[in-house]
Amino acid sequence: MNLNTKYHGCIEYEEKDVIYFEKGIPGFEELKKFIIFPVEDNDVFSVFHSIEKEDMGIIVISPFNIEKDYEIQLEEEQRKKLELQNEKDALVLNTVTLNSDIDKITVNLRAPIIINIKEKIGEQIIINSDKYKVKHPLFKEEA
């Protein structure tokens, strides 16, 4: 299948690549089906893209590229919803807010996207802790 995206051209994908979000994601609750593909010529960023809306793609990054000790505790209800039997089946991604000023690019570490890569279901959750910021700077200033 092909997805003609507004910003990334034509992306080829298969039905098995589609990840289902029962509640959508905050701000886009009506969108339930997404795919993930790498940003061209970049090993760090990926695109989390709706297959239902050609101009709805979000840049995402693994939190472990930013915070080596990033840790979340899923509640039992969340584990059940995601059908997670094993934490190795969980893919954790965080949304990136781009800016033309590289120092103002931020990552939302407070609301990770959790995906069961085996079952292809996902949910964006909110961590009830001040440990992580909604607007964590992608690039820390050197001391």
UniProtKB/Swiss-Prot annotation:
Acts as an anti-CsrA protein, binds CsrA and prevents it from repressing translation of its target genes, one of which is flagellin. Binds to flagellin and participates in the assembly of the flagellum. GO terms for cellular component: cytoplasm. InterPro entries: Flagellar_assembly_factor_FliW, Flagellar_assmbl_FliW_dom_sf. The gene is fliW. Belongs to the FliW family. Keywords: Bacterial flagellum biogenesis, Chaperone, Cytoplasm, Translation regulation. This is Flagellar assembly factor FliW. It is found in: Cytoplasm. Transmembrane segments: none annotated. SUPFAM superfamilies: BH3618-like. The keyword Cytoplasm applies. Interacts with translational regulator CsrA and flagellin(s). It comes from Clostridium botulinum (strain Okra / Type B1). GO terms for biological process: bacterial-type flagellum assembly; regulation of translation. The keyword Chaperone applies. The lineage of its organism: Bacteria, Bacillati, Bacillota, Clostridia, Eubacteriales.
